[in-house]
């Protein structure tokens, strides 16, 4: 193989996106973002990690410095952030759990909490070969001054980054 071909192949491997994500639609009344990520681990291990968000959700995308995230999988359970000084935020609420395969959460992530908007965040997990594919979507509707379409790309970027963190965390457990 030529040195140039090897260099090109190495560059492609190093720059390959860990997840496929996109803004599927965006209007003043709402948006849909989503994608999928292939994870080199069995679904059971991915599920365990997915349901422990404190281990993979970036500390740069939390309300409170030094906070912890928890997820109660009971219906109506809280994806909550707790600061050491007692401050707490209920980011999402558990709507549906199919252990090992599907998780649906409802609510407004981040600054959407203070808007007249809410959404459904769905994770579908399937085995693929020796690994897994995690497909996700976040569908948001409601009202905010200036419309919701401008929120779609930033929300997609944040969620895509978090799921890349999840992939890295799960695959590093080998």
What are the residue ranges of the model-derived segments?
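Bacterial N-terminal signal peptides that target proteins for export
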Residues: 1-8
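Cleavable N-terminal signal peptides
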Residues: 8-9, 19
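Hydrophobic/aromatic beta-strand elements that line small-molecule binding cavities or substrate pockets
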Residues: 35-37, 69, 90-96, 119-127
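A mature extracytoplasmic/lumenal domain signature
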Residues: 43, 50-52, 83-85, 96-98, ...
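Beta-strand/loop substructures that line and gate deep hydrophobic ligand-binding cavities in soluble
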Residues: 110-157
């Amino acid at each position: 193989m030529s040195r140039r071909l090897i260099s090109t192949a190495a560059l492609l491997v190093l720059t390959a996106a860990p997840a496929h994500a996109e803004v599927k639609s965006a209007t003043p009344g709402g948006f849909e973002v989503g994608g999928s990520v292939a994870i080199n681990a069995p679904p059971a291990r991915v599920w365990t990690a997915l349901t422990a968000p404190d281990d993979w959700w970036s500390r740069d995308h939390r309300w409170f410095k030094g906070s912890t995230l928890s997820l109660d999988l009971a219906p109506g359970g809280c994806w909550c952030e707790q600061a050491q000084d007692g401050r707490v935020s209920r980011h999402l609420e558990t709507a549906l759990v199919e252990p090992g395969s599907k998780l649906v959460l409802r609510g407004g992530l981040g600054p959407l909490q203070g808007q007249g908007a809410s959404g459904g965040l769905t994770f579908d997990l399937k085995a693929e070969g020796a690994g897994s594919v995690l497909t996700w979507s976040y569908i948001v509707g409601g009202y905010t001054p200036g419309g919701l379409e401008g929120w779609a790309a930033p929300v997609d970027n944040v969620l895509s980054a978090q799921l890349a963190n999840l992939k890295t965390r799960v695959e590093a457990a080998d």
